[in-house]
From Swiss-Prot:
Cofactor: [4Fe-4S] cluster
Organism: Desulfitobacterium hafniense (strain Y51)
Enzyme class name: translocase
Catalytic reaction(s) noted: a quinone + NADH + 5 H(+)(in) = a quinol + NAD(+) + 4 H(+)(out)
Major localization listed first in the record, in broad terms: membrane
Protein name in the entry: NADH-quinone oxidoreductase subunit B
Gene3D superfamilies per the UniProt record, alphabetical: 3.40.50.12280
Length: 173
């Protein structure tokens, strides 16, 4: 009787190995998050024009699942800071970031958002939005091409899908 039960159990395990996908729930959630970013619109200067062009038919970021730009930060999980950020705009940037639900990511698009750009020496400019919010991906250029934004989104997707290979920092700390 025990031999028959063991044989039946082995057959069930073999069948399960062929037909059942075993994974952790985090991997499944990260896969879903990485393939359906919902960016909040936060265009500040000329980089915002390139961000809008990325949604057009020539580049078409919707083929990657990123076409849903949200007007409300409560419905977004990615903030794309596109352009020059002044010191007066910094508290609003932080407020919008704080309104986004976890998990959330930030992309600094362009030289101005990354390091201040040509206005870095100005009294009213931030020398990078990473002084206000934690930035996950930097996209260089003045302004960067729409293809660069697609590349940055794909880098963020890789970062989300492989948190064990890429160190993700906990936001807000």
């Amino acid at each position: 009787m025990d031999v028959a039960k063991e044989k039946e159990l082995r057959e069930a395990e073999a069948l399960m190995e062929k037909n059942v996908l075993l994974t952790s729930i985090d991997k499944v959630l990260n896969w879903g998050r990485g393939h359906s970013f919902w960016p909040v619109t936060f265009g500040l200067a000329c980089c915002a024009i390139e961000m809008m062009a990325a949604g057009g038919p020539r580049v078409d970021i919707s083929r990657f699942g990123y076409e849903v730009f949200r007007a409300s930060p409560r419905h977004a999980d990615v903030m794309i800071v596109a352009g020059t950020c002044t010191r007066k705009m910094a508290p609003l940037l932080r407020m919008i970031y704080d309104q986004m639900p976890e998990p959330k990511w930030v992309i600094a698009m362009g030289s101005c958002a990354s390091a201040g750009g040509p206005f870095a020496d100005s009294y009213s400019m931030l020398t990078g939005v990473d002084k206000i919010v934690p930035v996950d991906v930097y996209i260089p250029g003045c302004p960067p091409r729409p293809e660069s934004l697609v590349y940055g989104l794909l880098q963020l997707q890789h970062k989300v899908n492989h948190p064990d290979k890429v160190r993700l920092l906990k936001h807000g700390k």
